[in-house]
Curated annotation (Swiss-Prot):
Tissue: Expressed in ciliated cells of the node and in the ciliated ependymal cells of the subcommissural organ (SCO), choroid plexuses (CP) and ventricular walls during embryonic and postnatal development. Expressed in developing and mature pancreatic endocrine cells during embryogenesis and in adults (at protein level).
Name recorded for this polypeptide: Transcription factor RFX3
GO MF term set: DNA-binding transcription factor activity; sequence-specific DNA binding; transcription cis-regulatory region binding
Gene giving rise to this polypeptide: Rfx3
Assembly and oligomerization: Heterodimer; heterodimerizes with RFX1 and RFX2, and RFX6.
Organism: Mus musculus (Mouse)
């Protein structure tokens, strides 16, 4: 190959520049212009079809001829690592023309040789090079043993090239091709590449048709849409999946983005499909101690499997499982600390109980991971030997080998005896807290991550049924054990309801935080709030440091002005919580201080909302939504922080007062070390009469209004700070107002 400096048309040297933006997986090769003097007509023809741009290099053998039809013959060289490529003989050629950064060069289909010497035919493919990298468009592999490229997202140059390709191959009009850009952008906004997942081709096209219908766009046909998909998401493979007779073509390696609105659309469509199916007859359930194949629990005699409803449920469950964290495992259960054995039991019975309960909890975890919540009731009935004489719903419960095995390992009589022992109660409660915490982290691994509405509704229905299922399954178990178990499962159900509500609020608030006009309006309305008045009113109740409150106000406005994301707001709230509770770390009063902080936080936020309401702020709705989210997320943060400090699980923290029968004023103030508690409780022993009532009686003498303020501050206010005395303040002796020459006076009746 040579570079001539002579020519009748141009006197400049035609040179080439090596590529600096190419992927290691695909060598970039581009066309070199030939000397103008030798092949004037041929060069003119080539220039009309192929273009040479800076930032690329092409190697052409000296003996190669130039084809006038635009088909460029190229040669590739095997390599093992990223480097500058050149011929074995000859030098590198550089081009100094132009400096465009957004250029695209097309190389026709050619053969490639892998590093292992395997011939790979790439047919119908195009290489697109730009400043962002090199992309392979619309290729197919004859040898799947070596992958030329990996599935990746297209660059802007790829989008432009895809439009040109479709316009040339399908003969699209200029008007229709101009619409392809919006179609391609819609694909990039709603889909992403992922390993090990697939989507039916018909589903993608139906989503596309719905998008075109909503935006009044002219859709392309299914074949052209398939080309769009492959031009944007390179390396996609097509598979035929499904049962025999019902298989469909799927794109393998692509999925709907978690935050895409198509997720909600897909869930709603599946839900409506299930609602339109006729109700099947009730199936006969076979109780299981541990579920190896969860589908077996739903199979009854005379029932046909593989129906459309079952297929819909299976597809929905598989889609939902990508939102779960199936890597969670049960924590290790501790040993039972028991000093004396109950009558009629041995240590072997206790070991059998530990082993059986561990297997029982593992079966529950397996069922939850597979989203088959209805099996939980059957598992509970099997473990607790539920045996009603006449089932209320007419279902038939069949004795199984698993139930016989459980009975042989630990008879029901011994199970009931062990359930009465305090050590067994405490051990099983700790096991439940650990298991339920693992289930929460499986179902809702991130409270801020979008969750499909159908999955959220399924979790809430599951939480609503838990207490009834467990109470019904334990109908023959001692009442003390039932109370312990129900308290734990109630905390679990409450946590699921709170977290799903928090997730729903997070998705609603995310849209507000991403709206620039709404953020500006919120900031304008917030600057009109009289925070000095808010602090003056709240300080009497909360007694917070003025400097800290002012600092929080400044930080909140600054974070709002920066248009922070939801995740950045979450980090800010966590920092506020850590600073507020830092003085109480390592002290026994930490849990109570955390609860007091929640009350103060809620009181301050309600005062701000009240001011916005009175001012008829235009952004009141946005502030109300944000306030609900931040209050709920602060509750979430405090809950986990208390669990971390106390060494317990969040479920255990919330289940501390889960048993309503055990709640009493003494339990509510059991935290020791509280300064407020020590000051208010020391006077209770001096008189049999409650302190609040005694203080109110002492005020029976008439005082002018101006003289009562110091008395109220010194006497009534400390009582308000203690929940023990709140009921006495409400039910204290009535007073009547009397008018006198000196002013209004109050006398006890």
């Amino acid at each position: 190959m040579q570079t001539s400096e002579t020519g009748s048309d141009t006197g400049s040297t035609v040179t080439l520049q090596t590529s600096v933006a190419s992927q290691a997986a695909v060598p970039t090769q581009v066309v070199q212009q030939v000397p103008v003097q030798q092949q004037v007509q041929q060069v003119q023809t080539v220039q009309q079809v192929q273009h040479v741009y800076p930032a690329q290099v092409q190697y052409v053998e000296g003996s190669d001829t130039v084809y006038t039809n635009g088909a460029i013959r190229t040669t590739t060289y095997p390599y093992t690592e990223t480097q500058m490529y050149s011929q074995n003989t000859g030098g590198n050629y550089f081009d100094t023309q132009g400096s465009s950064a957004q250029v695209t060069t097309v190389v026709s289909s050619h053969s490639m040789v892998g590093t292992g010497g395997i011939q790979m035919g790439v047919t119908g493919g195009q290489l697109i090079s730009s400043s962002g990298g090199t992309y392979l468009i619309g290729n197919s592999m004859e040898n799947s043993g070596h992958s030329v490229t990996h599935t990746t997202r297209a660059s802007p140059a790829t989008i432009e090239m895809a439009i040109e390709t479709l316009q040339k191959s399908d003969g699209l009009s200029t008007h229709r091709s101009s619409l392809l850009n919006s179609h391609l952008q819609w694909l990039l906004d709603n889909y992403e590449t992922a390993e090990g997942v697939s989507l039916p081709r018909s589903t993608l096209y139906n989503h596309y048709l719905r998008h075109c219908q909503e935006h009044k766009l002219d859709p392309v046909n299914a074949a052209s849409f398939g080309k769009l998909i492959r031009s944007i998401f390179m390396g996609l493979r097509t598979r035929r999946l499904g049962t025999r007779g019902n298989s469909k073509y799927h794109y393998y390696g692509i999925r709907v983005k978690p935050d895409s609105p198509l997720n909600r659309l897909q869930e709603d469509m599946q839900y409506m499909a299930m609602r339109q199916q006729p109700m099947q007859q009730k199936q006969r359930y076979k109780p299981m101690q541990k579920v190896d194949g969860v589908a077996d629990g739903f199979t009854g005699s005379g029932q046909q499997t593989g129906t459309s409803v079952e297929q819909t449920v299976i597809a929905q469950s598989q889609h939902h499982q990508q939102f779960l964290d199936a890597s969670r495992a049960l924590p290790e259960f501790g040993e039972v600390e028991i000093s004396s054995l109950p009558d009629g039991t041995t240590f072997e019975d206790i070991k059998s109980l530990q082993s059986l309960y561990r297997e029982h909890c593992e079966a529950i975890l397996d069922v939850v991971v597979n989203l088959q919540f209805s099996l939980i009731e059957k598992l509970w009935q099997t473990f607790w030997r539920y045996s009603p004489s006449t089932p209320a719903d007419g279902t038939t419960i069949t004795e199984s080998s698993n139930l016989s095995e459980i009975e042989s390992r630990l008879p029901k009589a011994k199970l009931i005896t062990l359930c009465k022992h305090e050590s067994i109660l405490k051990w099983m409660c700790n096991c439940d807290h650990g298991m339920y915490q693992a289930l929460v982290e499986i179902l809702i691994p991130d409270v801020l991550r979008p969750i499909p509405s159908a999955l959220t509704q399924a979790i809430r229905n599951f939480a609503k049924s838990l207490e009834g299922w467990l109470s019904n399954a334990m109908n023959n178990i001692p009442q003390r054990m039932i109370q312990t178990k129900v308290a734990a499962v109630s905390a679990f159900a409450q946590t699921l309801r709170r977290y799903t509500s928090l997730n729903h609020l997070a998705q609603a608030a995310r849209a507000v935080l991403q709206n620039t006009s709404q953020i500006n309006q919120m900031l304008s309305d917030l600057n009109r709030v009289d925070f000095a008045n808010v602090q003056e009113q709240a300080s009497w109740v909360c007694q917070c440091d003025d400097n800290m409150v002012q600092r929080l106000e400044t930080d909140f406005k600054m974070t709002l002005q920066q248009q922070s994301t939801l995740e950045q707001w979450a980090a800010w709230l966590d920092n506020v919580m850590m600073q507020a509770l830092k003085p109480y770390e390592g002290r026994p009063s930490f849990p109570k201080a955390a609860r007091q902080f929640l009350l103060k936080w809620s009181f301050y936020s309600s005062m701000v909302i009240r001011d916005l309401t009175l001012r008829s702020a235009a952004s009141f709705g946005s502030f109300h939504l944000i306030r609900l989210l931040y209050d709920e997320y602060m509750f979430y943060l405090v809950e986990h922080r208390v669990a971390q400090v106390t060494g317990e699980t969040p479920i255990a923290v919330m289940g501390e007062f889960g048993d309503l029968n055990a709640v009493s004023p003494g339990n509510l103030d059991k935290d020791e070390g509280s300064e407020v508690e020590s000051e208010t409780d020391e006077d209770l022993d001096d008189s049999s009469e409650p302190r609040a009532k005694r203080e109110k009686t002492e005020l029976s003498q008439a005082f002018p209004v101006g003289c009562m303020q110091p008395v109220l501050e010194s006497a009534v206010q400390p009582s308000l700070l203690n929940p023990l005395h709140s009921e006495h303040i409400v039910t204290s002796t009535q007073t009547i107002r009397q008018c006198s020459a000196t002013g209004n006076t109050y006398t006890a009746v």
